[in-house]
């Protein structure tokens, strides 16, 4: 089949996940046209796919953040300012998809390709983790009503891939489905993570792309612990703190050998750490409902803890409980990406056998 694959560019986790699914689709004989938004996602996808699939940049909806919080007003302003240029670029890509003869659309939280599927009456499959907010039952953790920013997050989530024929939701927590046309699978991980083995050492990995100065201030007050820090924007050694340049292979090796991980509560970092059996201190972005949801489940399952901010007492308290978190992680349901691939294959197979 000729499959258009949409990838949202907010963060790199969506692109990393999409690479795995797209490579699987190519291996199954499908042709793929990738439409990716954001600054880094198109380049990452093109590099990882190596010409096996056509990758086209698009202009997606842009989310603006202020002091770690989602700014709805600024997001609207930014999107309106880019509307004319965005339309020209996007129209070129959609015309290319028409001329190519697209037969189905898969979207990883990307709204333009979802709109394209609906406007062309093409089958649409959504594959992402974000739909867990609205399609899974979270009563085990007290529901989602109290999550910061949840009202806006629900609206954005529903608007990304509305009316998809099916939703494949990747999740690390055992929440049952609450809506039809929903399949839950474990997280889709990079092959390098799946191949890595746990070998805990003494260091703690800290990864933070925002509010890095506050994190470093806290780490300096815990001199008894060696830290390997990613996301600082510089490299070097500052006493017990090593500032690391980002390298995929080294990062995975540092995580698999870490005593623990401190970082944001994004889905990719958290699920890679949990798969490797590494306890996590998660610091969700203020007003980012999905990260707060991840943190609540992390805490509920005993795999780590959450914190609104990081200071020395919080770090020491977390490390004092890290053995208990590691013990809980021994029961974490690990596995490869095959369940997710099977779900995608099943859906595409049904579309091929019954195109109506």
Regions found by a protein language model. Give the residues of each.
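Conserved nucleotide-sugar phosphate-binding/catalytic loop shared by glycosyltransferases and other
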Residues: 9, 27, 32-84
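Donor-nucleotide binding loops and adjacent catalytic segments primarily
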Residues: 22, 186-260
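A donor-sugar binding/catalytic signature common to diverse glycosyltransferases
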Residues: 104-109, 254-293
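C-terminal amphipathic helix plus adjacent low-complexity
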Residues: 316-356
């Amino acid at each position: 089949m000729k499959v258009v694959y949409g990838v949202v560019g907010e963060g790199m986790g969506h692109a990393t996940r999409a690479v795995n699914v797209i490579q699987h689709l190519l291996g199954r004989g499908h042709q793929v046209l990738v439409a990716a938004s954001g600054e880094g996602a198109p380049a990452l996808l093109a590099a990882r796919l190596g010409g096996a699939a056509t990758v086209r940049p698009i202009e997606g909806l842009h989310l603006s953040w202020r002091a770690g919080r989602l700014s709805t007003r600024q997001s609207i302003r930014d999107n309106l300012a880019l509307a004319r240029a965005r339309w020209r670029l996007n129209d070129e890509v959609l015309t290319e998809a028409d001329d190519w003869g697209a037969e189905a659309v898969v979207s990883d939280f990307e709204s333009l390709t979802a709109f394209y599927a609906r406007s062309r009456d093409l089958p649409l499959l959504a594959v992402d983790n974000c739909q867990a907010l609205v399609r899974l039952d979270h009563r085990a953790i007290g529901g989602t009503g109290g999550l910061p920013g949840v009202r806006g997050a629900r609206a954005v989530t529903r608007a990304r891939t509305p009316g998809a024929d099916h939703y494949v939701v990747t999740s690390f927590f055992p929440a049952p489905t609450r809506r039809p046309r929903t399949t839950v699978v474990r997280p889709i991980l990079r092959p390098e993570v799946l191949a890595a083995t746990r070998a805990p050492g003494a260091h703690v990995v800290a990864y933070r792309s925002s509010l890095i100065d506050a994190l470093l201030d806290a780490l300096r007050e815990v001199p008894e612990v060696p830290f390997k820090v990613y996301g600082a924007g510089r490299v070097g050694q500052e006493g017990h703190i090593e500032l690391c340049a980002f390298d995929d292979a080294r990062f995975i090796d540092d995580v698999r050998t870490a005593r623990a991980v401190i970082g944001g509560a994004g889905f990719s970092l958290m699920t890679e750490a949990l798969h490797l059996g590494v306890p996590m201190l998660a610091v969700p972005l203020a007003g980012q409902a999905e990260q707060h949801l991840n943190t609540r489940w992390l805490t509920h399952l005993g795999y780590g803890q959450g914190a609104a901010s990081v200071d020395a007492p919080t770090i020491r308290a977390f490390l004092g409980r890290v053995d208990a978190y590691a013990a809980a992680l021994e029961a974490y349901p690990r596995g490869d990406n095959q369940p997710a691939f099977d779900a995608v294959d099943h859906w595409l197979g049904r579309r091929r056998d019954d195109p109506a």
